[in-house]
């Protein structure tokens, strides 16, 4: 469909700021009904693009029937999910030369109390450089006392900013470093500056989309995009209505806006249903892990703090390939490792957190973050070489508290200070933390010992010495169901003293199977 777009069309040529023209738009058809006809005279349920839900009202392309509550085949579900993942990119493709504009709030609730503008700009710059072909050509920190107004800045600063942007023909777009822009604000700024303007939400969401690998992550990104589609809908439909007499689809009694809003609601419902199916599968996997009684350690931290590198160092898994960029990990993965006690644990790599991360993104990734709530221990990785390490810690803890995690899980959290090799002579000033360098391998044994003790305490496992008969099945059962640390054979008795780490439930089974 030609008209309604959730984002910038790929390859769209942006007008130069010096020419004072907005980006060209396609000519509108004479009425919304003709726009619908342009897609092949399909029914509203068949609209394509970011608003449509697929090729039909049923996942298999057929029509749904009243009272038809049979479960759809799995391959139909797969096809329907792929349809939901289709959509236009949120940001323009190709090389972009970005002007980074940071509003420096001087007072009021919008003023950050724990950070400085220069570090906020540095993080925003890192976000831009995460995108292929994007570079920051100008950075402007502009003070404001009115961040909630439509144009964000005062009259004098706004005029000065507009003059600089329009006078720089090398600028192709502006990244306004605010969490979200209202649709009227975006419209006014783009009209004033002559280039497209993006906020933090849009940039981060586009990075999420680029880095999502599994279907679950891609569906969660699609769900997070829904507020953006809604905010763009009114603007795009208003453009479609310009010069049009009727706003209603012929014979439907439904306006074009109402139609698109309904399609959005239907698409969101389908995404949530698909995520619910995947959530149930994830629940089954967790049950299997629980039956095998592997302790689970969720590794959390600020984005690019070195979580994946640390997991690779702890497990020795050569298949793990860390990347030095923001939000490199969006898909939760589990990796087995062995602690000094010979206990096998699963390290769960999670999505990195970010300050001013829009709440809707966290909500959309709730299925992924459920793994944190079901873990036995949380390992909080901090990049102590970063000048904003304390602010990053506060952001992570605030996000974890927002997940409604059990209090014992938060209280037992282990904190590790990573990248100490970048801070000469580093010595932690906080108690109960472990300094390491995941890249250099420093401090890993101390960290494993700390995790060993913490897992034993968190899971209620106990270290016991059990005497077993060598001729029986007891020893092989213990090797399968517990962690055998040491076996001291007593030949004259035909027995052995076995030192094990065993859970309460496994010990109960052992006593029941081998009484006496």
Swiss-Prot record:
Residues 18-82 are annotated as: Disordered. Mg(2+) binds at residues 308, 329. It comes from Homo sapiens (Human). It comes from the Eukaryota. Ubiquitously expressed. SUPFAM superfamilies: P-loop containing nucleoside triphosphate hydrolases. The gene coding for this protein is located in the pseudoautosomal region 1 (PAR1) of X and Y chromosomes. The lineage of its organism: Eukaryota, Metazoa, Chordata, Craniata, Vertebrata. Disulfide bonds: none annotated. Residues 295-459 form the Hflx-type G domain. This is Putative GTP-binding protein 6.
């Amino acid at each position: 469909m030609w008209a309604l777009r959730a984002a910038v069309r790929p390859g769209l040529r942006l007008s130069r700021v010096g020419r004072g023209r907005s980006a060209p738009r396609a000519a509108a058809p004479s009425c919304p009904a003709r726009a619908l006809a342009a897609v092949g005279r399909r029914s509203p349920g068949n609209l394509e693009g970011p608003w449509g839900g697929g090729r039909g009202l049923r996942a298999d392309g057929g029509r749904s029937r009243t009272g038809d509550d049979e479960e759809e085949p799995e391959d139909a579900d797969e096809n329907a999910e792929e349809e939901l993942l289709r959509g236009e990119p949120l940001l323009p493709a190709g090389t972009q030369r970005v002007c980074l504009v940071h509003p420096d709030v001087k007072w009021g609730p919008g003023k950050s109390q724990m950070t400085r503008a220069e570090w906020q700009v540095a993080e925003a710059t890192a976000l831009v450089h995460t995108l292929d072909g994007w570079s920051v050509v100008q950075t402007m920190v502009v003070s404001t006392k009115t961040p909630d107004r439509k144009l964000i800045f005062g009259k004098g600063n706004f005029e000065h900013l507009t003059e600089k942007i329009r006078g720089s023909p090398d600028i192709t777009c502006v990244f306004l470093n605010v969490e979200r822009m209202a649709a009227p604000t975006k419209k006014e700024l783009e009209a004033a500056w002559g280039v497209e303007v993006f906020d933090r939400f849009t940039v981060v969401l586009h990075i999420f989309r680029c880095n999502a690998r599994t279907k679950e992550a891609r569906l969660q990104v699609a769900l997070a995009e829904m507020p953006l589609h809604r905010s763009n809908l009114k603007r795009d439909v208003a453009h479609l209505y310009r010069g049009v007499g009727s706003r209603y689809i012929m014979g439907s009694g439904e306006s074009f806006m109402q139609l698109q809003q309904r399609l959005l609601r239907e698409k969101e419902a389908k995404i949530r249903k698909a995520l619910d199916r995947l959530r149930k599968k994830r629940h089954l996997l967790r049950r299997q892990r629980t039956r095998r009684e592997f302790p689970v350690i969720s590794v959390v931290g600020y984005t690019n703090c070195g979580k994946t590198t640390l997991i690779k160092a702890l497990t020795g898994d050569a298949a793990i390939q860390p990347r030095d960029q923001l939000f490199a990990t969006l898909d939760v993965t589990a990796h087995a490792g062995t602690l000094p006690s010979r206990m096998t644990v699963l390290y769960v790599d999670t999505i990195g957190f970010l300050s001013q991360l829009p709440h809707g993104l966290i909500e959309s990734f709730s299925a992924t973050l459920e793994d944190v709530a079901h873990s036995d221990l949380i390992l909080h990785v901090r990049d102590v070489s970063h000048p904003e390490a304390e602010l990053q810690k506060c952001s992570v803890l605030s996000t974890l508290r927002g997940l409604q995690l059990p209090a014992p899980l938060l209280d037992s959290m282990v904190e590790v200070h990573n990248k100490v090799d970048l801070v000469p002579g580093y010595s932690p000033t906080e108690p109960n933390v472990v300094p390491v360098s995941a890249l250099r391998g420093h401090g890993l044994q101390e960290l494993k010992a700390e995790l060993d003790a913490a897992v034993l305490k968190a899971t209620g496992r106990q270290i016991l010495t059990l005497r077993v008969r060598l001729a029986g099945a007891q020893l092989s059962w213990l090797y399968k169901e517990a962690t055998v640390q040491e076996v001291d054979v007593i030949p004259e008795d035909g027995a052995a003293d076995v030192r094990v780490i065993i859970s309460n439930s496994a010990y109960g089974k052992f006593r029941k199977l081998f009484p006496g």
